[in-house]
């Protein structure tokens, strides 16, 4: 929720009163927290390879695991973590290299990488456990790669679409970072979505 509040502060600072929030992975969770806190300020929401925050979608085992990921990241051999981390989130060389480059920032400081990742998973678990509605009251779009193997993203998105009727677009052959695997397609979907909202507003 801190991130959603920071986002609101930034939008206020910039004088933006009606926003289309686009969030990838953790960014999609921030968007849902923003919708919970400021439901009247969002005119659109795009989730890219993220998942619903409602408690009903997540098993108790998944929440238990989210809270305990830091030691896994800390004790996993760094070379293997680097390989699985970069190859696990993307299918394209471009996407994998971006992830590898980011992870190499922590080369020699795996403990710090594990702390940051663990913190992210714990705040996600805490947001889910709040058991809030996280209702999206504005036009929305779900985007997910067909090769997204991060957690249970594919299963979550199918259920999210089925339960809410929010349109879901699959990005063929893309991984968890579908915006880096198929950037042109994802950008086009976002552009069209935002243009439709703008048209409705005028």
Regions found by a protein language model. Give the residues of each.
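Active-site loop/oxyanion-hole signature of alpha/beta-hydrolase fold enzymes
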Residues: 1-22, 188
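Short, hydrophobic alpha-helix immediately C-terminal to the catalytic nucleophile
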Residues: 8, 32-36, 187, 191
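Active-site acidic short loop of glycosyltransferases
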Residues: 12-18, 39-40, 137-138, 165
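Flexible "cap/lid" loop of the alpha/beta hydrolase fold
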Residues: 36-37, 43-75
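Conserved alpha/beta-hydrolase catalytic His-Asp/Glu region
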Residues: 56-58, 75-135
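Conserved loop-alpha-helix segment in the C-terminal half of the alpha/beta-hydrolase fold
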Residues: 140-174, 180
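Catalytic active-site module of serine/aspartate enzymes centered on a nucleophile-bearing elbow/loop
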Residues: 164-202
